[in-house]
Amino acid sequence: KYRLCALLTRISQLVIDQPDITSVELNPILASNGQFLVLDATIGLSRYKAKANRKRLCIRPYPIELVKEVTLKNNTQAQLRPIKPEDEQAHLEFDQSLSKEDRYKRFFGELPQFNHDQLAKMTQIDYDREMAFIVSQEQNGSACTLGVSRVLMDPDKLDAEFAIVVRSDCQGLGLGTILMNAAIEHCKNQGVKQIAGITLPENTGMIELARKLGFKITRDFEEGSINMVLKLN
């Protein structure tokens, strides 16, 4: 069973890595003593088109093209990339590193520590309709999450909502700008017309960052919140 899963995984990765492939047929496959031998294979190819490639797979694979290196204000290097399932433990540690004040500003209240199911939803996402960018940096031999920005798009991808939080001891390093610019650029590439977010009036750092990036800032006195809206495209 394990070797069959490994075979299917390799075929799937081949299809992901080679956008020219339109079909794969392996027939017959000889199975003996836990080993699989492909006796004949037929692979269909077509001319590669970048835009068409976005829709060729039912489930969008990990968008490795969005991974890039960034330099923080303290002149250290970090990696900006989409979140992935393997980040669950690092994401738990990231959440635990937030001060009560920063956590309150992010979630608009006091929440208990996230459990496995909640963390799974945060790290196992559908890249076609949502995105979570993290800035990750090696510290003491392991990858640590310094900040995260999330974008959730409507089904028609005309509007999107964002949220962002930076580790309490890493604020002032330019992480907010890096994460917000990544979220905005991703929305533009997806054809989103408007990106919006809500924060608390006391979250002055977020408000100033949004204003600097061109968001329209309005206050909802009835809800006691600040609305941030940016028109795109």
Annotate each predicted stretch with a short phrase.
Residues 46-233:
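Long, contiguous binding/interaction regions
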Residues 1-23:
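A long amphipathic alpha-helix within ATP-dependent nucleotide-binding catalytic cores
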Residues 11-14, 30, 180:
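A broad "ordered helical/assembly scaffold" signature
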Residues 20-43, 162:
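Conserved metal-phosphate-binding beta-hairpin within the catalytic cores
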Residues 8-12, 24-26, 65, 118-119:
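Glycine-rich, charged/polar anion/phosphate-binding loops
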